[in-house]
UniProtKB/Swiss-Prot annotation:
Protein name: Methylated-DNA--protein-cysteine methyltransferase
Cited InterPro entries: MethylDNA_cys_MeTrfase_AS (IPR001497), MethylDNA_cys_MeTrfase_DNA-bd (IPR014048), MethylDNA_cys_MeTrfase_DNAb (IPR036217), MethylG_MeTrfase_N (IPR008332), MGMT (IPR023546), MGMT_N_sf (IPR036631), WH-like_DNA-bd_sf (IPR036388)
GO terms, molecular function: methylated-DNA-[protein]-cysteine S-methyltransferase activity
Source superkingdom: Bacteria
Function: Involved in the cellular defense against the biological effects of O6-methylguanine (O6-MeG) and O4-methylthymine (O4-MeT) in DNA. Repairs the methylated nucleobase in DNA by stoichiometrically transferring the methyl group to a cysteine residue in the enzyme. This is a suicide reaction: the enzyme is irreversibly inactivated.
Record's keyword terms, sorted: Cytoplasm, DNA damage, DNA repair, Methyltransferase, Transferase
GO cellular component term, pick one: cytoplasm
Positions of the catalytic residues: 139
Pfam families: DNA_binding_1, Methyltransf_1N
Family: Belongs to the MGMT family.
């Protein structure tokens, strides 16, 4: 049975749930107000193998590392390991998201083209929306083709804050 360690941490944007496995690979990061979404994704991805969730304090130093990110050490999120469920296509999109440099953005069509699927912008958007590891798998760095801030499960205000925090200048 998969054992998931979880902790709720304080951030400038509100409480954030951090969930990892016993090897301290992130399995989920989600804002408190969207905890139901996180629980649905955990069930979708891990119910077949069975899992239990256990309260933990700073598992693997992950909570401290996320606090460091919010304090300005932006590069720390690139060092964090993830282990996600999802379809092969979703995992491919999530891996591509991690390659978008801090302070930069892409639109869904650019990301689809980068994956060799230029007609799959909507599918990329759907995979982006199913991302279980907010911030570390930086789905907030994907914007609409016309530059609008669209499609962040944590809310557009948080997306804007994260992009500004990372140095992306919004007009």
């Amino acid at each position: 049975m998969l054992r998931l360690l979880e902790e709720k941490i304080a951030t400038p944007l509100g409480p954030l749930w951090v969930v990892c496995d016993e090897q301290f690979r992130l399995r989920a990061i989600e804002w408190e107000q969207y905890r139901d979404r996180m629980e649905q994704l955990l069930n979708i991805h891990y119910r077949h193998e069975g899992y239990e969730r256990v309260s933990a304090t700073n598992p693997g130093g992950l909570s401290d590392k996320l606090a460091d990110y919010f304090a300005g050490n932006l590069a720390v999120i690139d060092t964090l390991e993830t282990a996600t469920g999802g379809t092969p296509f979703q995992r491919e999109v999530w891996q591509a998201l991690r390659a978008i440099p801090c302070g930069q953005v892409m639109h869904y069509g650019q990301l689809a083209a980068q994956l060799g699927r230029p007609g799959a912008a909507r599918a990329v958007g759907a995979a982006n929306g199913a991302n279980p590891i907010s911030i570390v798998v930086p789905c907030h760095r994907v914007i609409g083709r016309n530059g609008t801030l669209t499609g962040y499960a944590g809310g557009v205000q948080r997306k804007e804050w994260l992009l500004r925090h990372e140095g992306y200048l919004l007009l």
